[in-house]
């Protein structure tokens, strides 16, 4: 990260990383899925916390207590929000504040240009909820998109 995290942000990153590792372990052992979420008050730096977490997952991370997690360069993240403007703001902040993400690793999913059957490994996809509604173009078949097998 290009910025130093405040102690409560560091703690949030570690707590989230532990929760994600536990969720992945539960999925692998039992096939059980679960949601891991970040909740914090306005101005607490949720985007910075999430950016540090994502950067740490891609590149590996260790903590002062000796806890360490291997890199997961093929992880896929979907950044979901209600508005395209908020997605753009979040994407720009992540690109500005992280130091280890590659150029092009952050991808905005738009109805006009997105044409993939599956998301590619190692990317952060920014998507707003309207695009995946029942009437959204991303959830319907068309003459140019048919990924049924």
Predicted regions and their residues:
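RecA-like P-loop NTPase motor core of helicase/translocase proteins
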Residues: 1-149
């Amino acid at each position: 990260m290009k910025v130093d995290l405040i102690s409560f942000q560091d703690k949030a990153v570690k707590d989230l990383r532990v929760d994600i590792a536990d969720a992945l372990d539960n999925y692998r052992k039992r096939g059980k899925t679960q949601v891991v979420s970040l909740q914090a008050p306005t101005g607490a730096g949720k985007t910075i916390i999430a950016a540090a977490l994502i950067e740490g997952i891609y590149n590996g991370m260790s903590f002062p207590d000796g806890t360490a997690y291997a890199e997961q360069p093929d992880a896929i993240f979907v950044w979901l929000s209600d508005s395209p403007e908020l997605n753009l703001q979040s994407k720009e902040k992540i690109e500005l504040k992280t130091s280890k993400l590659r150029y092009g690793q952050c991808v905005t999913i738009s109805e006009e240009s997105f044409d993939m059957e599956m998301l590619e490994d190692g990317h952060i996809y920014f998507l707003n909820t309207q695009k995946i509604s029942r009437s959204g173009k991303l959830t319907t078949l068309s003459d140019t998109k048919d990924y049924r097998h």
